[in-house]
Amino acid sequence: MALLKISVVVPEGEVYTGEVKSVVLPGVEGEFGVLYGHSNMITLLQAGVIEIETENQKEHIAINWGYAEVTKERVDILADGAVFIKKGPDDRDDAISRAKKLLEDASSDRLAVSSVLAKIESL
C-alpha cells in the first residue's frame, strides 16, 4: 500500500510530519478520510481531532480551525492552533488540558466543543 505524506503546521512551526496510511480530518461539512490517490481539494477545517493512522499505530492532533490541501500523494494542513495528543499518561493529561483550552478559545458553540472534548478524552 502506498503511503500518504502529511504535514501539520501552525504559525509557530511544524507540529507533525510523516508518511501515513490514512488521515481523518474535521471538515466544516463533516469528517472525511483521505487515502493515497485521493482527489485534489482545498477545504476549511473546523475545531476537532485529526486522526492519523501510521503503519503500526494511531495518533491524534486537536486543532481549533485551519485549512487542508489534499493531493494524490500528500495532505498539508495549516492550522491556527494544534495540540499533539501523546500516548503517555503524563503527556496525555497535559495535552488534553491544552487541547481543551485551545478548543474553548476557538468556538462559542459549547455543544461542538463538548463533543470534541469527549472524543479526545476517550482516546
Question: Where would I find each of the regions flagged by the language model?
Answer:
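Compact, glycine-rich, soluble single-domain proteins
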Residues: V9-K100
